[in-house]
Amino acid sequence: KAVRWLLRKVRPLPTIEKYNTFHHLTPLFGPHVRSLPHFYENQVTINNTISPISKVHDGVLMNNLEFNNLKALLPFYLRKYNAYSIYRMSVDGSSINSFLKKCRNEKLCILTIKTKSKTIGAVTTTPLSLSYHGTFKGSDTYVFDLTNNIVYRKSMKNDYCISVQNDSITIGLGDSGSAIYIDQYFTRCFSSPCETFNSPPLLSPNSKENILDIEVFRLGV
């Protein structure tokens, strides 16, 4: 009788058919598993089971769920932050000067770029300021395809993370090109295979697209 009573009280485990992948099932067994990312060489796929905890404030190009999914794949020291919109091209103007003025002195940022087909971007831990004589700043930088839930972390091939010039913004560099290249007036975005992140073209199957909007978020408590 005691065994039958216990069996009635125990909730049956969910069947695997209810989930797309095993990783959708694992969060039921403890919070320590919940935020584990999936690593496939240099590519990371977003775990869509992350519950929104941090918030996006005044943002348009990234919502709370997308932000928390993205954060789950970043280093632990970045996961405690909220995202605050500090620059949006459609509001603040489409020039490098406007961009730099709004992003001045901000070290931890998420840059998002919306095109007709995708939203892509980068997470940077170095200030978005003019680079000295065209040099690249090395930092803990990531590029991502927000539409397809993929993040690429920096490889060991080079340290060409980000360069901000009066006529362009470049993220990543290699023999094949940059992961993200934004022209002077923020009209077009180019993306090529990039050695810095060992990433394919983020706009694939296209190599360039017109920019619909750009938004920068600062990370803070």
Locate each region found by the language model.
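Phosphate-recognition beta-domain surfaces
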Residues: 1-221
